[in-house]
UniProtKB/Swiss-Prot annotation:
This is Rubrofusarin-specific efflux pump aurT. The keyword Transmembrane applies. Disruption phenotype: Leads to pink mycelia in young cultures which turn red in older cultures, suggesting a delayed production of aurofusarin. It comes from the Eukaryota. Belongs to the major facilitator superfamily. TCR/Tet family. Residues 1-12, 30-42 have a biased composition (Basic and acidic residues). Residues 17-27 have a biased composition (Pro residues). Residues 1-42 are annotated as: Disordered. Pathway: Pigment biosynthesis. It comes from Gibberella zeae (strain ATCC MYA-4620 / CBS 123657 / FGSC 9075 / NRRL 31084 / PH-1). Signal peptide: none annotated.
Amino acid sequence: MTDNTDMEKLDRATTPTPIPNEAPPTSEPSESKPEEAEDESKYPHGLKLAAIILSNMVAMFLVALDRTIIATAIPRITDDFNALGDISWYASAYLITSSATQLLWGRIFTFYPTKTVYLVAIFFFELGSLLCGVAPNSVAFIIGRAIAGAGSAGIYSGSTILITTVTPLSKRAGYVGMMGAVFGIASVIAPLIGGAFTDHVTWRWCFYINLPVGGAAVACLILLFPKFPVNEPVSVKQQIKQLDPWGNLVFLPGVICLILALQWGGEKYAWDSGRIVALLVLACVLLLVFIGIQIWQQENATVPPRLFKIRNVWLGTIFAFCLGSVLIVFLIALPIWFQGIRGTDAITSGIDTLPLVLSLVFGAIVSGGVINGVGWFNPVFFSSVIFMSVGGGLITTFVVDTPTRTWIGYQIILGLGIGQGMQLASLGTQVAVKQSDVPTGVSLMFFAQSLGGSVLVCVAQAVFNNELRSRLTSFDGIDVARIIGTGATQLRHVIPADRLAEVLVEYNAALRSYFYVGLAAACFAVLPSLGIEWKNVKGQEFVH
């Protein structure tokens, strides 16, 4: 898609002056027109590049670890703090600040040096981890989780932004794929590490571990990350204006209300309760006001509206939303199937999902290598949605006695699809926008991916509960409410032994409706993948 001359002039006339950051190249070609081969001599090479990338991977590893390491530590934490009622906040505090600050970090990365902002994000993450480790009570622990969540959002998007700063476009896909692989590996081993610390040392080491490892990464980045030319500084007033304070003033509480409604709805409170309805209404109002402010602010907006005139941006946002939905829905539903239908415990069900996660890692690495080799990322989009749709569809055929080789194979197919697509929306955005817009574009993709998982998993849970209720109401002597409120691992303890087999058949059928929501998201992802603009990243520098 190519903007006309008048629009290009308008963009240049209305673009705010950046404050100290890596100075973007002076040329601004049209969105679709490639230039000559990129000069790779300006980027770090050899051991220096390897050390920077390794430090970046370590930071991403810690963030991924922190997301799930707490799962096996929560029982011991609640024992120490005598705060069983706070369990939901241990996850919610992290998720709320991570989601709410994602776009703000993108804006900060746009106007300040990548190195400085990335180190600040790591600082917040480390500070939150330290507070969690030394927390004397549950309130302090929750505050620490909130601070760490805010820092994790900056690291999550910053890790990709850092790669765009130190690597040429032609080699970027491989490094981005490696980041996806690191995230997958950390997600697999996090519960195991958390369990080991909790059982053999103390749960506090789940958070202390971030300090020395993260500190080493920080030292490496401080010493080795290259210096780039910076633009002339502007006034403090202009800096504040460029960070869109009015937009963030309504966006942050809007996202907080939405996440709380999604976290509490159907669990702590009924969906039609006054609290949930009020939160949803308030979230809608605040987010609509945010959209209005973005249109009003234009270039000073958190997400400049002109970005949505670029096909790869708005289609990439939809694709990222779908991908995040598929990932989270199946990551939650599969352990429920293993625990509820096959009768495994929580740890064993985690091991049983290894085929999905390991194939996801493999898919992320291979897709990066393929894009580096051939230059085109569009075929990988197609491959991703095909594998996701086929794998998701096959998983919906699970029955009570599905053999081991079958559920392993189906997970591998799904994992390959998700892994291939993990970083595609981000990469498609990078080649379609100006270099100065890359931080905003990348943060937007990650926000959409996170939001997709949060929204669709609630939809899937509601569909599952309704389906299960409708299937079990005709069973005499069965307490439907108790079954729905019971965790999957305890399912066999609340069902009479003589009715277990027939109830499991209905439970499996209801759980397939959970899978259908993930399958629907995978199939819908076909549409944006078909519309993504064809661009060859090999040996060319596109838009700056």
